[in-house]
């Protein structure tokens, strides 16, 4: 064995390539061994350094692949299993074990994560040259017994099924030991590069090959100073020094320090020496130079998006300077959080890149198909799982319109569970749904699915056949073909890989579970676990791309230009964590009890020295320039600076703040056309003249003209970011169809409230007639109708029975009404809602029972009022009461808390009670002095705070809560005193005030009708304070944003509380000429006010449909 080491300023791969080439010239077969994750990059570099750029005698590979070259022709009839196959073996083993057989892991028998941990431990034991019997000294004896039982059963199953149960290196090891390869190995030379440690399996193999091979050359990076030091703990080269010293001691070899004639980058060499001296507590007579500051830069950026954008701009500048994409390497501290940003921004900058990370197949439609299939069975036909299956694009050739109809109905009827999906759908809403069509669709969707999922427990081979029949019935193969015909080349390749993985899993299921009795649940669970564990294999489309990968795989001299992103404390250095079934303490005790070349890795013990070596490799990764960048905000949280970056700053490397001046007009900051375009769009053009000098203004003016020409040439339309949300006039033909001119405009109190809430909300509901998603479950509307019906029956019962008996009879009769019986017996939740409603009816009824001074005149009174032959006001009054003096009043039942607020009324948001009084006045042909008021009766159980109310006052306070609240005529209050009426001064009005309210209410209707007839509906939700919006913004449709569009909101007129009623009445009483409401496109002005107003909530207080 020959051991070589060199400084990181030297290129070790070049040195080892010369060694390999010299042995090849002597007729030796050379294997150049690199770590698995680096074999591709090593092969490329070795080929570059070979004098002839290629050699048949030198093979760049990894340990496991090298073994195949020697044992490829060796007969091995055993079936090979990959990780998915091993997982199936463990699944089968655990399937035959009961919970009581495994004392620690009994509850995890079918947990896919636990099975994956078993697979990882199985492979780790192979790499450690151990068996499960070596797992002694665990924290729990029961844990050891469980693992021995599981692994022993798995080993028996592998042997019984004639599966290959050893790794490639183990098979190679056996062939070497047998002596069959002595002749071939005697002419073989191994050159090992890129390692700072061997696994136990690799270590044993190297020891064996050292006696058989012609030569083994091992090279690594360290300094002479570090290797010769007596104390290396904490040294930046501790990992490689320990590695070298162990090999030197084992094989009695003195390592040689080697160099080349080529001098590396002096700046990186100097920085490496300075860092080394900081960690070995020595001093060097060197300082950082200006050249060093140019070669190594430390950036600080606000966030990840800006960080990637700055790197992209620098890459575009390097290209402008004549560099190639392949000369640039981008390293990531956290791959997952940067993947999306890198993809989006590099595409914007037209930078081709290769992300060297396997991508999960989990988002592919076929994987979603299998996942949904398993979840449907596991959760007994949960609606969301079944809808995901049929909407995967691979389930039958159904039209999208049919699938949308099916989904809409399932959500409406709340279909859950196998029984409901197999039964005919019967629920309907005003005959809105074509049940024959929907049930025919249900049969086509559910029948083939249920036929497969309802299969009894049987052999795996039989279930596979039934699965194939099911897949053909739902046309999965043809749908996959159809999916590929519309796909891009990259997507076609992905589809091919997914299909290959799917069929491979089915083959392994046939092999392992063919004769095993399986339930459909277990069968689908196996398929799902296998598919979710699959990854896409990615290969760069061309060599000339920017390589992107995680930084901890970096090697010195990887590329001329290197950008390392996300170098924060959390990710640089990376701290390895133990996530296996064995703790660090257990691993340590096992290692102490085993002999040489048998060892479990303890990741946490090597974190420090591994972190130092990776950092030094990163600092020497570039041959020209290295940029280390850290964002202040990463993964939406603030992170501190890495200790390694702090060390660089202490050495004198300056911290460069990037992205502070995003719109600086420098040629080397533009990058490319798309970036310039996005920058111009982002600029606020109204501030250009204020913020930029004349020269910069000229630059941007020219740039904008250039961009406009490019946009026109390429026919590119840029979505505008608008600061207002405007609407266009509704077509006259549409208005004539919805609101014919020859007919009066129909309005109700609810429609009027909607209009003054937000004009556009009225347009959606009453012009387009859009509806919210319905549900078969009762809601506030149904609850209100139920209580209406109860009280209607109670008040209409003229029998001699007691009031309480009448009430109970009314509740029983209402419960038996077919609509309510269906609604309130659907499930436990519905029955509970009915129970609450019955309690509310009994609580509220006490108000009706004690109201002797009032006689119920009529109930459910429909009215149509005609205003000037142009407006028809419609509605239903819940109850009309008559006092003993003949005065009439209105009662409206409410399930929520409502009061008459004159401020809301003035602003058009509470016209209901006044509208009902107008209906009484015109229907009964009475004057205002013959009305006693309009009020709400809140149908609810009083809720009292027992901490604030004593028991002696509890009954009185509860009774007080059950009162009529609204507006009352002051002259009639003497007849109401002592009853359940809230007669505060602020809600009592004399005859003249009531006339004012009635007249102003008509003005509200007329003003609204004028706007509606015009066809101009503004997006103007109301605001009470001008700072926040209370009206319905309908954001998903209008894109209204309070912070940007507050100017279009309708601001309500708010007056001080003192004298509020009188002030509003005075405003209403002004002559119509002085107080005419002017309704424009964006504002609705009210008397003596000219503000904009807005709305955000649909007023659903009216519990019946007008």
Swiss-Prot record:
Native organism taxonomy: Bacteria, Bacillati, Bacillota, Bacilli, Lactobacillales
Pfam families: ADDB_N (PF21445), PDDEXK_1 (PF12705)
GO biological process terms on file: double-strand break repair via homologous recombination
Anything else known: Despite having helicase-like domains, this subunit does not have helicase activity.
Transmembrane segments: none
Top-rank taxon: Bacteria
Cofactors demanded by this protein: Mg(2+)
UniProtKB keywords: ATP-binding, DNA damage, DNA repair, DNA-binding, Exonuclease, Helicase, Hydrolase, Nuclease, Nucleotide-binding
Protein name: ATP-dependent helicase/deoxyribonuclease subunit B
GO MF annotations, alphabetized: 5'-3' exonuclease activity; ATP binding; double-stranded DNA binding; helicase activity; hydrolase activity, acting on acid anhydrides
Annotated EC: 3.1.-.-
Oligomer status and interactors: Heterodimer of AddA and RexB.
Described function: The heterodimer acts as both an ATP-dependent DNA helicase and an ATP-dependent, dual-direction single-stranded exonuclease. Recognizes the chi site generating a DNA molecule suitable for the initiation of homologous recombination. This subunit has 5' -> 3' nuclease activity but not helicase activity.
Source organism of this protein record: Streptococcus thermophilus (strain ATCC BAA-491 / LMD-9)
Family annotation (PANTHER family): RECBCD ENZYME SUBUNIT RECC
Family of this protein: Belongs to the helicase family. AddB/RexB type 2 subfamily.
């Amino acid at each position: 064995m020959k051991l070589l080491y060199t400084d990181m300023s030297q290129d070790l791969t070049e040195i080892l390539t010369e060694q390999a080439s010299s042995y090849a010239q002597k007729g030796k077969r050379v294997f150049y061994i690199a770590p698995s994750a680096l074999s591709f990059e090593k092969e490329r570099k070795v080929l570059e350094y070979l004098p002839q750029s290629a050699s048949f005698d030198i093979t760049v590979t990894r340990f496991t692949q090298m073994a195949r070259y020697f044992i490829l022709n060796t007969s091995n009839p055993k079936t090979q299993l990959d990780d998915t196959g091993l997982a199936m073996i463990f699944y089968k083993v655990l399937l035959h074990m009961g919970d009581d057989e495994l004392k620690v892991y009994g509850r995890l028998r079918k947990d896919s994560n636990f099975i994956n941990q078993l697979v990882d431990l199985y492979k780790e034991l192979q790499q450690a040259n151990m068996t499960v019997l070596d797992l002694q000294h665990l924290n729990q004896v029961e844990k050891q017994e469980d693992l021995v039982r599981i692994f022993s059963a798995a080993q028996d199953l592998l042997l019984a099924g004639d599966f290959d149960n050893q790794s490639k290196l183990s098979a190679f090891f056996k062939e070497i030991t047998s002596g069959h390869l002595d002749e071939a190995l005697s002419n073989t030379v191994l050159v090992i590069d890129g390692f700072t440690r061997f696994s136990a399996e690799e270590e044993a193999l190297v020891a064996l090959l050292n006696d058989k091979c012609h030569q083994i050359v091992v090279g690594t990076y360290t300094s002479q100073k570090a290797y010769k030091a007596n104390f290396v703990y904490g040294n930046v080269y501790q990992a490689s020094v320990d590695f070298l010293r162990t090999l030197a001691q084992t094989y009695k070899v003195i390592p040689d320090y080697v160099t080349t004639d080529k001098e590396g980058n002096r700046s990186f060499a100097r920085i490496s020496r300075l860092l080394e001296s900081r960690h070995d507590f020595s001093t060097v007579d060197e300082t950082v130079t200006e050249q060093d500051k140019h070669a190594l830069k430390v950036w600080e950026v606000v966030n990840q998006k800006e960080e990637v954008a700055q790197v992209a701009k620098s890459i575009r500048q390097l290209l402008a300077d004549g560099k190639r994409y392949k000369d640039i390497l981008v390293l990531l501290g956290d791959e997952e959080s940067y993947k999306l940003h890198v993809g989006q921004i590099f595409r914007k900058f037209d930078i081709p890149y290769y992300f060297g990370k396997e991508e999960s197949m989990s988002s592919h439609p076929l994987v979603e198909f299998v996942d949904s299939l398993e979840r449907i069975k596991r959760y007994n036909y949960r609606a969301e799982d079944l809808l995901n299956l049929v909407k995967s694009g691979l389930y039958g050739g159904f039209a999208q319109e049919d699938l949308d109809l099916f989904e809409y109905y399932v959500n409406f009827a709340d279909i859950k569970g196998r029984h409901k999906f197999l039964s005919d759908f019967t629920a309907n809403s005003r005959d809105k749904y074509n049940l024959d069509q929907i049930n025919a669709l249900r049969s086509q969707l559910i029948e083939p699915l249920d036929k497969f999922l309802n299969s009894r427990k049987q052999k795996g081979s039989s279930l596979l056949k039934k699965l194939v029949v099911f897949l053909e019935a739902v046309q999965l193969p043809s749908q996959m073909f159809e999916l590929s015909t519309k796909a891009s080349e990259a997507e076609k390749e992905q589809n091919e890989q997914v299909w290959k993985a799917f069929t491979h899993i089915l083959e392994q299921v046939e092999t392992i579970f063919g004769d095993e009795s399986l339930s459909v649940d277990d069968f689908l669970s196996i398929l799902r676990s296998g598919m979710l564990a699959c990854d896409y294999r990615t290969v760069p489309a061309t060599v000339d791309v920017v390589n992107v990968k995680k930084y901890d795989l970096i090697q010195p001299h990887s590329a001329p230009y290197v950008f390392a992103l996300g170098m924060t404390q959390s990710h640089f250095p990376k701290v390895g964590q133990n996530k296996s079934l064995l703790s660090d303490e257990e691993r340590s005790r096992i290692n102490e009890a085993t002999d040489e070349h048998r060892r479990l890795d303890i990741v946490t013990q090597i974190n420090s020295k591994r972190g130092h070596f990776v950092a030094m490799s990163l600092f020497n990764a570039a041959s020209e320039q290295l940029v280390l960048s850290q964002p202040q905000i990463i993964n939406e949280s603030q992170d501190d600076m890495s200790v390694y970056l702090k060390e660089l700053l202490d050495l004198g490397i300056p911290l460069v703040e990037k992205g502070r001046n995003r719109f600086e007009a420098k040629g080397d900051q533009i990058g490319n056309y798309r970036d310039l375009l996005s920058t111009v769009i982002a600029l606020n053009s109204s501030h250009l003249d204020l913020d930029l000098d004349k020269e910069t203004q000229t630059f941007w003016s020219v740039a904008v003209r250039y961009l406009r020409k490019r946009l026109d040439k390429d026919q590119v339309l840029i979505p505008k970011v608008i600061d207002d949300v405007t609407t266009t006039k509704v077509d006259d033909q549409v208005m004539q169809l919805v609101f014919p001119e020859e007919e009066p405009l129909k309005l109700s109190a609810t429609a009027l409230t909607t209009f003054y809430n937000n004009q556009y909300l009225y347009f959606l509901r009453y012009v387009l007639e859009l509806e919210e998603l319905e549900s078969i479950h009762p809601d506030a509307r149904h609850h209100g109708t139920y209580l209406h019906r109860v009280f209607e029956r109670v008040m209409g019962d003229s029998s001699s029975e007691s009031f309480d008996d009448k009430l109970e009879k009314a509740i029983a009769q209402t419960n038996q009404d077919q609509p309510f019986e269906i609604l309130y017996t659907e499930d436990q939740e519905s029955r509970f809602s009915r129970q609450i409603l019955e309690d509310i009816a009994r609580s509220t009824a006490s108000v009706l029972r004690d109201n002797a001074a009032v006689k119920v005149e009529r109930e459910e009174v429909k009215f149509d009022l005609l205003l000037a032959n142009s407006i028809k006001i419609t509605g239903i009054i819940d109850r009309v009461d008559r006092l003993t003096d003949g005065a009439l009043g209105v009662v409206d039942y409410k399930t929520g808390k409502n009061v008459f607020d004159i401020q809301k009324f003035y602003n058009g948001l509470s016209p209901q009670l006044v509208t009902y009084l107008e209906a009484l006045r015109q229907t009964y042909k009475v004057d205002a002095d013959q009305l006693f008021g309009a009020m709400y009766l809140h149908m609810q159980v009083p809720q009292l705070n027992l901490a604030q109310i004593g028991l002696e006052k509890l009954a009185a306070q509860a009774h007080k809560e059950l009162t009529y609240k609204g507006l009352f005529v002051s002259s009639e209050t003497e007849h109401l005193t002592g009853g359940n009426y809230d007669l505060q001064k602020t809600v009592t009005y004399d005859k003249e005030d009531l006339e004012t309210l009635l007249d102003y209410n008509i003005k509200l209707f007329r003003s609204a009708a004028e706007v509606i007839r015009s066809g101009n509906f503004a997006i103007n939700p109301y605001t009470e304070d001008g700072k926040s919006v209370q009206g319905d913004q309908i954001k998903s449709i209008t894109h209204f944003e309070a912070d940007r569009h507050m100017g279009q909101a309708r601001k309500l007129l708010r007056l001080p509380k003192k004298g509020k009623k009188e002030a509003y009445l005075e405003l209403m009483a002004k002559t119509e000429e002085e107080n005419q409401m002017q309704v424009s496109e964006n504002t609705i002005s009210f008397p003596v006010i000219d503000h904009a107003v807005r709305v955000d909530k649909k007023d659903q207080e009216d519990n019946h449909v007008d």
